[in-house]
Curated annotation (Swiss-Prot):
Catalyzes the condensation of pantoate with beta-alanine in an ATP-dependent reaction via a pantoyl-adenylate intermediate. This is Pantothenate synthetase. Beta-alanine binds at Q61. Keywords: ATP-binding, Cytoplasm, Ligase, Nucleotide-binding, Pantothenate biosynthesis. It catalyses: (R)-pantoate + beta-alanine + ATP = (R)-pantothenate + AMP + diphosphate + H(+). GO terms for biological process: pantothenate biosynthetic process. Homodimer. It is found in: Cytoplasm. The active site is at H37. Its main location: cytoplasm.
Amino acid sequence: MIVCKTPEEVLDQVRLWKAQGKRIGFVPTMGYLHEGHASLFEECISKADKTVVSIFVNPAQFNDPEDYAKYPVNTEGDLKLCESKKVDLVFLPNKETIYPDGIPDIVLKIPNLMKSLCAVSRPGHFEGVLLVIFRLFHFVQPDFAFFGKKDYQQYLLIREFCNTLAFPIEVIGCETVRSSQGLALSSRNSRLSETEKEESLLIYRSLKLGENQIFSGIKNPLLVKEIMKDVLDSSSKIRLDYLEILNADTLDPLEVLEGEILLAIAAFIGPVRLIDNLTLSVPTS
């Protein structure tokens, strides 16, 4: 496995592979890797000839400096996991490498997909995501890029970003990996106590209850949201950020629960903010 710390090293290796006719797959991460990331690596390896993983905690996407400071780091463990999964190249830059002149004063937006969810509750977050992805795509020049659907809005934004700018990159969304009890795997879970992990299972239970209500025939989104919210309100440890039911393609509000549907929750368990979602396909009447 090759480990690169500069864009020049990455570009040199990628150009060599492309000269050999190899297709490049890319999985950008912020490190503290877990089995959810490993599933992205496996998807990438199955589709691409060469797999590149980046590990970079991007300061531009944190609207809370304390959240950035507390983001977990385990570089040694991350490299071991990448090697065990047969990743070909790990790009391990630092902040000065990605932003040599500091974080630039440029704003990247896709307004139609940034009217709700994390775009509203974390101002500036997705602008920072799009900025770093733009740079990483420039350095890695991938044919395919893989993103987990746990961060569903991010996946939609990056897919639309590539389409709008005519990047020759296929953006592939991969299903959320969960614990045996249903908790979506996340690097932030490491900051939860065992009691908080138990409480956080209510997020998935709320989503599954919403799914069951919709498939039972309920068409009113407000009614389903109230039923889902009751589950979360049963715990004093959960502080709801948002609970939304939206069109899964456009992120627009729904008046009737039909077609492609996104159920999305963000909530704080203690100081830790977790997100999760389900997507449903409901036949129209």
